[in-house]
Amino acid sequence: MSSYFVNSFCGRYPNGADFQLHNYGDHDTADEQYRNSTTMHSTRYGYGYNGMDLTVGRDGTGHFVGNERTRGYSENHSATAASVESVRYNQTTNTTGTSSLSPPPDPLPCSSVSSASPVTETQPQHRVVKNSVTTPCSSSSGGTLLVNRDCASKSSPLEEEKPAGGATPQNVNDSTQPQIYPWMRKIHISHELSGPEGKRARTAYTRYQTLELEKEFHFNRYLTRRRRIEIAHALCLSERQIKIWFQNRRMKWKKDNKLKSMNMASAGGGVYRP
């Protein structure tokens, strides 16, 4: 509730003693201190008072003095807006059992501004509690030192677990990969095109592939590019493999013919004697 709304009642009702407070509920159970407004203590307004105080700014004659009201409003008007809601909240929580039959509290009077200092002193405590809840690991106040120690003790196991977690993948990799020594390597066994030390893998042809290549070599010892592509697709081989096979087959054919010619020459020379 704004301070403008609270102080507006002071101007409308200057003579507070002429207005009597209403007492609701059972007269036997109700508290007697709510009936007389002139004998009430100023510190009870924020905690147990359910009526409205209309005795502020009165002189001895019972008339309202405008200068006193203006001075009291200017000095304490900054603390009114901040403490109105907290005072109303404390009033409802503290008087639940004693004044259950009483009506809802009215707006705070003008004189409660001077008695709002106990409430304003509790506001920093609420702020400290709020800071400790939002940032439990911060050192904003002395009451959070134990919380800081707890946070430090909780964070240290997490930091200790990080190196252990980071070291586990290396151990797993070491266990899954067996150690290979140089003498265990077999250079001549490789399925890649370019093996270690630049040695190419040996291609193993099936019986069907060898038979088809021999038929093609019987008709044509040299292949064109178009025919090489057709054979490669038919036998599921690469053009390079087809070319190398034909090169090796021609070398073998030349070697065989050379041996035949040498045998024929040696045999004919031995028979013929001039």
Curated annotation (Swiss-Prot):
Residues 75-91, 116-143, 168-177 have a biased composition (Polar residues). Residues 198-257 bind DNA. Keywords: Developmental protein, DNA-binding, Homeobox, Nucleus, Transcription, Transcription regulation. It is found in: Nucleus. CDD domains: homeodomain. One of its GO terms (molecular function) is DNA-binding transcription factor activity, RNA polymerase II-specific. Residues 92-101 have a biased composition (Low complexity). GO terms for cellular component: nucleus. Pfam families: Homeodomain. Residues 68-177 are annotated as: Disordered. A motif (Antp-type hexapeptide) lies at residues 180-185. It comes from the Eukaryota. The keyword DNA-binding applies. GO terms for biological process: anterior/posterior pattern specification. Belongs to the Antp homeobox family. Sequence-specific transcription factor which is part of a developmental regulatory system that provides cells with specific positional identities on the anterior-posterior axis. This is Homeobox protein Hox-A5a. The lineage of its organism: Eukaryota, Metazoa, Chordata, Craniata, Vertebrata. The gene is hoxa5a.
